[in-house]
């Protein structure tokens, strides 16, 4: 069975896609959101990041050639966005999670002024 034929993988990818759409739909509204809306938006980002981290781990553990290609494309995309080509993606995910924690702290401290 191909990696992408798995019901679990397909469901994860569908959920990632839905979360991405929700995040992108509201990203430009973020500056005008109130405190609770901002916290909800950051929560969506956290869920998206967790799902992406899990999918990346699954891709990394798979022997499926298509999964390996997708993993390589993710690394290529990260490099095109300015990350060094030898970046450890798990470190990238961890750093992104820390950034989201900082955002939540800022929202709590400053209300809606983030």
Give the positions of each predicted feature.
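Short terminal alpha-helical segments
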Residues: 1-39
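A broad "ordered helical/assembly scaffold" signature
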Residues: 2-7, 11, 39-40, 46-47, ...
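Generic structural concept
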Residues: 10-13, 17, 42-49, 75-78, ...
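Amphipathic alpha-helical interaction modules
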Residues: 25-70
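Amphipathic alpha-helical binding modules
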Residues: 72-114
């Amino acid at each position: 069975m191909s990696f992408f034929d798995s019901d679990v993988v397909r469901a994860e990818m569908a959920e990632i896609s839905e979360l991405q759409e929700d995040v992108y739909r509201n990203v430009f509204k973020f500056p005008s959101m109130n405190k609770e809306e901002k916290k909800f938006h950051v929560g969506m980002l956290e869920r998206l990041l967790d799902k992406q981290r899990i999918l990346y781990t699954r891709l990394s553990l798979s022997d499926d050639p298509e999964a390996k290609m997708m993993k390589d494309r993710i690394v290529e995309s990260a490099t095109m966005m300015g990350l060094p080509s030898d970046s450890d993606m798990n470190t990238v995910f961890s750093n992104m999670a820390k950034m989201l924690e900082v955002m939540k702290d800022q929202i709590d401290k400053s209300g809606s002024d983030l």
